[in-house]
């Protein structure tokens, strides 16, 4: 699920933190990819009749098709991926997972009903909601990656948290996931849309955490508190607290402890905190997740030459993929994994930290930019109001 409305807040308050670019801009970089999130996106890539891709025997192959060809595209562009798979979810997440399961059960019933009486759009909508990544999907994707020579890691719990560890240690350039909570786990850089298909023509979004914190004028603890208030995988949001209110509450009070105190002591009782709302435990999961350290043996990974005959046996003989396409893809994989060994020039230079004076100048510029945006918004609203109040036919 990730963090509700976080990207919107970053766009509005820290636009300089987001850089949109092409996949080829990341040539020569190593990237840790959230495997479970990627597999889910492959599974919902359904056909027009609302069905997943399957083999001749009826086995689902959407996850393998996506993993094979999207990974190939990544490697074609000189990127070296390492996939990270989810382990057991934290106990605090069980409530959210139970709700997801309930929603999927309800969607399955609605899907059956839509097939009988609904439109094609309704069938597809409910079909997407019933999708679930199974252990079998994960195991088949791991088998495929091994045959491709692409490394993977099993995280103890959350894949995003393990990706963040690798990024902080410099073992990879960035963590790649669609889940914005990757930033809460302290990943310096988050890449979004990396595993999207080329046909979607979505730019790769590169989000820098230090610029997010600078733009929001928050430290990491306040940022995590904001994300919890927005609604995360561990806790429901507080009813009636939207993104703008959440941001204002953290800015006004500085921490969730103070926000909770202010809400409870408000005589108007504008907001009600849910009875079971263990925000301190949720915060602890972001600050101290169950992860393997970057120097752990399980976090040692390397890229190997693909096992071409193994790929043919698995994808062609067992899953009915086209042999010509698989062999051609394996040849590209072999060639491009070698090309990706080339280093980027930036790897030879260390970034110079900004001085306090430079930080102050940047902060002032950012505040001036926000003031101009607010002023323009007010002027636009005023002009709109005046235009509405004018009788029709006048100029």
Swiss-Prot record:
Region: N-domain, residue numbers: 1-104
Keyword DNA damage: yes
Keywords: DNA damage, DNA repair, DNA replication, Endonuclease, Exonuclease, Hydrolase, Magnesium, Metal-binding, Mitochondrion, Nuclease, Nucleus, Phosphoprotein
Region (Disordered): 360-395
Binding site for Mg(2+) 2: 179, 181, 233
One protein family per Pfam: XPG_N
Domain of life where this protein originates: Eukaryota
Cross-referenced InterPro entries: 5-3_exonuclease_C_sf, Flap_endonuc, HhH2, PIN-like_dom_sf, XPG-I_dom, XPG/Rad2, XPG_CS, XPG_DNA_repair_N
Protein EC: 3.1.-.-
CDD domains on file: H3TH_FEN1-Euk (cd09907), PIN_FEN1 (cd09867)
Binding sites annotated in the UniProt record for Mg(2+) 1: 34, 86, 158, 160
Region (Interaction with PCNA): 341-349
Enzyme class per UniProt: hydrolase
Extent of Basic and acidic residues compositional bias: 360-389
One Gene Ontology cellular component: mitochondrion
Places the protein is found: Nucleus, Nucleolus; Nucleus, Nucleoplasm; Mitochondrion
Post-translational modification: Phosphorylated. Phosphorylation upon DNA damage induces relocalization to the nuclear plasma.
SMART domains: HhH2, XPGI, XPGN
GO biological process, one term: DNA replication, removal of RNA primer
Residue numbers spanned by region I-domain: 122-253
Assembly notes: Interacts with PCNA. Three molecules of FEN1 bind to one PCNA trimer with each molecule binding to one PCNA monomer. PCNA stimulates the nuclease activity without altering cleavage specificity.
Family to which this protein belongs: Belongs to the XPG/RAD2 endonuclease family. FEN1 subfamily.
Record's function text: Structure-specific nuclease with 5'-flap endonuclease and 5'-3' exonuclease activities involved in DNA replication and repair. During DNA replication, cleaves the 5'-overhanging flap structure that is generated by displacement synthesis when DNA polymerase encounters the 5'-end of a downstream Okazaki fragment. It enters the flap from the 5'-end and then tracks to cleave the flap base, leaving a nick for ligation. Also involved in the long patch base excision repair (LP-BER) pathway, by cleaving within the apurinic/apyrimidinic (AP) site-terminated flap.
Protein name per the record: Flap endonuclease 1
Organism annotation: Ajellomyces capsulatus (strain NAm1 / WU24)
């Amino acid at each position: 699920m990730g963090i509700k409305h976080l990207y919107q807040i970053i766009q509005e308050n820290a636009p300089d933190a987001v850089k949109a670019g092409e996949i080829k801009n990341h040539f020569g970089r190593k990237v840790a990819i959230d495997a479970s999130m990627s597999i889910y996106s492959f599974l919902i890539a359904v056909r027009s009749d609302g069905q997943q891709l399957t083999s001749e025997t009826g086995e689902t192959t959407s996850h393998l098709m996506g993993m094979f060809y999207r990974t190939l595209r990544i490697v074609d562009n000189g990127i070296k991926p390492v996939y990270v798979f989810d382990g057991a979810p934290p106990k605090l997440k069980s409530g959210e997972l139970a709700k997801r399961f309930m929603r999927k059960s309800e969607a399955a019933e609605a899907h059956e009903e839509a097939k009988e009486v609904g439109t094609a759009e309704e069938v597809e909508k409910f079909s997407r909601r019933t999708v679930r990544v199974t252990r079998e999907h994960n195991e088949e994707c791991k088998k495929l990656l091994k045959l491709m020579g692409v490394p993977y890691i099993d995280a103890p719990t959350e894949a995003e948290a393990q990706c963040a560890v690798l990024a902080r240690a410099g073992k990879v350039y960035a963590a790649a996931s669609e889940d914005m909570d990757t930033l809460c786990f302290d990943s310096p850089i988050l890449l979004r849309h990396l595993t999207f298909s080329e046909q979607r023509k979505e730019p790769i979004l590169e989000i820098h955490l230090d610029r997010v914190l600078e733009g929001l004028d928050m430290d990491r603890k306040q940022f995590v508190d904001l994300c919890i208030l927005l609604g995360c995988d561990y806790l429901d949001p507080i009813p009636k607290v939207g993104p703008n209110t959440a941001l204002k509450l953290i800015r006004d009070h500085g921490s969730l402890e103070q926000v909770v105190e202010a809400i409870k002591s408000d005589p108007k009782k504008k907001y009600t905190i849910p009875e079971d709302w263990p925000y301190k435990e949720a915060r602890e999961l972001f600050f101290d997740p169950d992860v393997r350290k970057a120097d752990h043996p399980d976090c040692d990974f390397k890229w190997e030459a693909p096992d071409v005959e193994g790929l043919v046996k698995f994808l062609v003989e067992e899953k009915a993929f086209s042999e010509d396409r698989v062999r051609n893809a394996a040849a590209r994989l072999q060639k491009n994994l070698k090309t990706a060994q080339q280093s980027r020039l930036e790897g030879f230079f260390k970034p110079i930290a900004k001085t306090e004076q430079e930080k102050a100048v940047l902060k002032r510029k950012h505040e001036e930019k926000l003031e101009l945006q607010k002023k323009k918004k007010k002027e636009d609203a005023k002009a709109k109001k005046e235009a509405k109040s004018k009788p029709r036919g006048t100029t």
